[in-house]
Amino acid sequence: MAQDSLLSKGYEFADVEEKWLSRWHKQNAFATKMEDGKDAFSIVIPPPNVTGVLHVGHALNNTLQDILVRYHRMCGDNTMWIPGTDHAGIATQNVVERQLATEGKGRHDLGREAFIERVWKWREDKGGTIVNQLKKIGSSCDWERERFTMDEGLSTSVREVFVRLYKEGLIYKGDYIVNWCPRCQTALADDEVEHEDSKGKLYHIRYPFADGSGSVVIATTRPETMPGDTAIAVHPDDERYAHLGEIGIKLPLTDRILPVVFDHHVEKDFGTGALKVTPSHDRNDYEIGIRHGLDLCKVIDEKGMMNDNAGKYAGLDRFECRKQIVEDLREQGYLVEIEDYDHAVGHCYRCKTVIEPTTSLQWFVSVKPLAAKAVDAVRDGQINIYPKTWYNTFYSWMDNIRDWCISRQIWWGHRIPAWSCADCGELIVETEDPTSCPKCGSSKLSQETDVLDTWFSSALWPFSTMGWPENTKELQTFYPTSVLITSFDILFFWVARMMMMGLHLMDEVPFKDVYLHALVRDKHGKKMSKSTGNVIDPLEIMAQYGTDSMRFTLTAFAAQGREIKLDEDRIEGYRHFINKIWNAARFAQMHIGDCDDSIRVAVETPKDLALGHRWILSRTAKLVEGIHRSLRGYLFNEVASLNYQFIWKEFCDWYLEWIKSDLFSDDLVARDQARGCLMVVLETILKTLHPITPFVTEEIWSVLPGERGFLATSAFPEVREEWKDEEAEAEMELLMGIITGIRNIRSEAEVHPSTKINATVICHDSKRADIIRSYTSGISDMTRLEGFTVVAEAEKPADAATYIYNDIEIFVPLAGLVDIEAELEKLSRERKKVEAKLKQINGKLGNAKFLAGAPEAVVAKVTGEKEELDAKLAKIDEASDRLKKLS
């Protein structure tokens, strides 16, 4: 695959990315291998919704997964990364229903079967968008194994699990309080409800005693549920209301008398110590109702409208009903007070409609016994969670978990495999469609119309994608999977449920490690949203800066437990880093392009090499060691930092400069040493960097000399202990300190880079002084010195600038090079000009009339000018301070 052509002057990322995506996929470079005697590494992708398009969270998540997969593949492990998408029941149905609405139709106009066909057609036409975008960011999945949660194989798994759990008594059907979305018209699980802070009202309402002897004030945020009140609850020890058990309380606006129940759930010191109990529309009230055998009176229907039980309010929208009831309470003297009240209101996670707690006949999973196994697995260390700060949150949630409502009143999804017999009422739950009732023989069977919660099929993802319930070779080789990488916000939606299902059905954990990454926010730490205009589109970023730049940026920001504040300026900065690598490789190619493998022999005996080569090999060995350690500890940002610091600071800024004279030398031994080390170090860099930036590294690798396969499938470097050389590192660090000192003096004194200068080093340690002297030539070349001396003592000239490195003093005479007084005078004049402009602008910005009357864009422009002038003033002052130090 090696080419003879020299790398182009500039890195044209669009062409390179297209080329390697095509070649990798054409040659099936990422196919799963199951070779005997090798370690296995497997990941299942968190399946994005089939309705989705790539957002920056997807880009982060899949970049981190890809880094691990590429690393383990290069380490020689049997590696499998299964891609796929989720059918996303509610979301997908909503998309297709909106499409139908543009045609003036609803799903009921089509009927269930035709509607489902329409959804499949939509999936065929549009569902591949997110998959193609995941490929575009370089995800090295085994794309031949792509799965969909409604695939035939996965549907078989879902049915099998449902039937098993039902027959074990872990799935049941019951009339319970659920979260209901009036827009989607379906039940939602607890963790599908998003609670948002809301500025509401608290209504204080007088409930009269039935005998007219008094009343009690009860506060509620939801007066529209009053027609559904079936009791008043007080604490058993509250003597104020002890007598009411025999009397009862009148429900305002009606003639109904409500019983008083005594329940320990009531806090007698909170408010008046009395609660209205509406079992059909509040979870806590429902529990009270069950304990006391209260009637269920449902007053709000599936569309969020008041039903016939609401009396004269029937037909009103629930929020309109609230207004009407409050007005009626006021008119009839029952309304005592309305106060502002901040509280959390539940919303549907899909359509954002305010949810309605209501009683409904639904299917549930009894999760307590399943959750206990998952908690034990985490406590025992069978599953590790990264970062560790999530352990307590996990335990707390699992300890307080409630049964999972798994039925959804929609059409798109896995239809529940349960049938009812019309003749005898028998409920039949089987993996295969029954033809007759096993109890009475009737053929009049009707299947449950509800479908399963999308998260039910997703909870089986780690093993259903590998062919369960069949005992496949994939399951034998790759289950449990190695690690799950996902966002922390679906720890309970998905991660915990996979633990429960995996442990119960497979008797093994579904993954050994869980890495929870943070959400990606804008540079100010604010949540990205279209309404605020701060969304960073990864596809636009890739088009502007290149995919590798985006991947490297996301990796650099992915510190465990830390919020990711994405700044486009940093993406641009890392694009410069990619260009730096390209230019360094191009320089190297000019010198090693005609080499063969024999040139590498130099690195086999590093002790015989010159200092610069021994130093870079030692640093390379430590780079590789650090990369292995960081990747196995999921310290992704450290992997980026190690590569960045080594490549930019050590390899490019120091090593390439240090060996230039050898590369152009007539001394063939010195030249071959330099070329051999350069090739080996460059190859190592490409390998350590490849998991993060696959495109640029694969392109550079392909043009290096020799026969080469894909870099993506080459061997990851091992730590070369024989390369480690503490003495070489100490000596090189000393020389780098001297060179840095001389360069700093030149920079601060603003001496032109081409101007030759003299430098003197005062070093009292004779051993270090000898080392410095022995590299006079190298130091002089890298700092453009005319004269260089190393002494134990010397008198510093009056016009010399000084730099202290540890206990070593460096000075450079500046006579004839810099007129400090003239430079200071010039800076002083420039400062006065800037101050005058700044005074004008500050006057404008301090003028209330200007701020109130000028267009927002004009104010923003003036503010920007002020910031630029402030920055310019700071630079002038910095330059003045530097010169004063030299004077």
From Swiss-Prot:
Gene name of the record: valS
Entry remark concerning the domains of this protein: ValRS has two distinct active sites: one for aminoacylation and one for editing. The misactivated threonine is translocated from the active site to the editing site. The C-terminal coiled-coil domain is crucial for aminoacylation activity.
Family membership noted in the UniProt record: Belongs to the class-I aminoacyl-tRNA synthetase family. ValS type 1 subfamily.
PROSITE patterns, per database record: AA_TRNA_LIGASE_I
Coiled-coil segments on the chain, per record: 814-887
UniProtKB keywords: Aminoacyl-tRNA synthetase, ATP-binding, Coiled coil, Cytoplasm, Ligase, Nucleotide-binding, Protein biosynthesis
Protein name according to UniProt: Valine--tRNA ligase
Residue ranges of the motif 'KMSKS' region: 527-531
Organism: Desulfotalea psychrophila (strain LSv54 / DSM 12343)
GO molecular function: aminoacyl-tRNA deacylase activity; ATP binding; valine-tRNA ligase activity
Broad class of the protein's primary localization: cytoplasm
